[in-house]
Amino acid sequence: RALVVNRTRELIELQNKPVDAETLNLLPRLKVRDLDPRPPYHQVQVGDLAGRQLLVSELPTNGIIYRHFGLDCAMLPARLLPCLDLFGTIITEIGTDTKDYMQFARELGMYTGGFSNSFNTYTRLGDTSEGCRPIAWFHLKALSTFLDRALSLAGEVFGSVSFANRQRIREIVLREFAWAEHSVQSEGYSLAASRVFAQLSLAGRYNEYVNGATSYLHLKELALDYDRREEDFLRVLEELRDLLFRKEALLLSVTGSAADISAFQQRAGTVVEGLAPGPVSAVVPEFSSFAPNQGLCTSAEVVYNVQGCRLFADPGQYNGHFEVLKTWISRDYLWNTVRQMGGAYGCFVQFNHLTGNFGLVSYRDPHISRTYAAYDDLPGQIRALDLSPQAMEQLILGTYGSLDPLQAPAAKG
């Protein structure tokens, strides 16, 4: 036993011993002077299509057109938001008045590269208010030769999606719950993080209701008692369809070559005009309040520890210097204290420079008290920070790489 204890102490001492500069200098590395001070930056062009805003990204895509149909969710009350992601999944699979789900799936497979949904919130740069724009996105990609077919399928979904196949809807709900249960065990940090950021901004509360713990718990209740809740759920799907599928709520985005973008602009007007007309009135959702300190129980033997705050009440306080500090926090401080010495599988920082919201996240972490002690000790560690010029250069290089990632055209657009 004494041998094991002594060996453990030796390993801890070795783990805490910093690597000497001579050893580090053996590694090949770039210099700051090797970096392009003005890396290429893609910026979308704003246009118009049938009276709706169109975001255009002209990029080489090898004959593939990426089309994104965004629907403004500002008119949705809070009670509908936990069903929004499930609604998006269902309408990308369920079929229409003229095509059952099997025929719809066959045509999607023949003429497109996929039809999917997502949700995001957008905050205007320099806006110090709590405002944000919540958008439900539907993503459709296809070869340029199948542009007409792909747009026809999208138009059918937005104009005549059918919820008549109750059995298929039940299957989708139960499948999504099974996947969500697995995700809670393997990627549970996202639920903890969404609860933390829900305390900090309106955008965080939207995300909590659509993709966070609130949405997951709602899905769990629905799946475990589906027979009793089915009628209410089907009415919610119809209500979401009627509120979202309106021309005035639509925002479009397209990525492709100049010729493909031109073809899209000429043909996509039929999709826009197929949506129901009518004004879209924004509402202020009545979100529930959450306790500042919470624990969400799962059957996993590891935990996900998240702690957050609003660092910059005024976004104007932010500048690029903080990105370098963030790199040190994530790749040096958290890596050494929470991962290497604490035994967590991972740890990182979540930060939004538009809202000033900041979070510390540990991933598959066997300890709680050690991790939160490391979080609480961070301000003191920053005040005492004294980096050599070589270490600072290394952090700048790492930050540059994070801000200038290699992206395919679809991601750039």
PLM regions with names:
Residues 58, 127-129, 241, 296:
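Residues embedded in well-ordered secondary-structure elements
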Residues 38, 203-206, 261:
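Generic intrinsically disordered, low-complexity segments enriched for polar/acidic and small residues
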Residues 212, 233-268:
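Non-catalytic, conformational "gating/processing" segments within enzyme and secreted inhibitor domains
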Residues 62-92, 99-228, 247-256, 304-324, ...:
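M16 family metallopeptidases and their MPP-like homologs
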Residues 1-92, 139, 249, 253, ...:
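His/Glu-based metal-binding/catalytic segments typifying zinc-dependent metallopeptidases
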Residues 50, 228-236:
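Short linear interaction motifs
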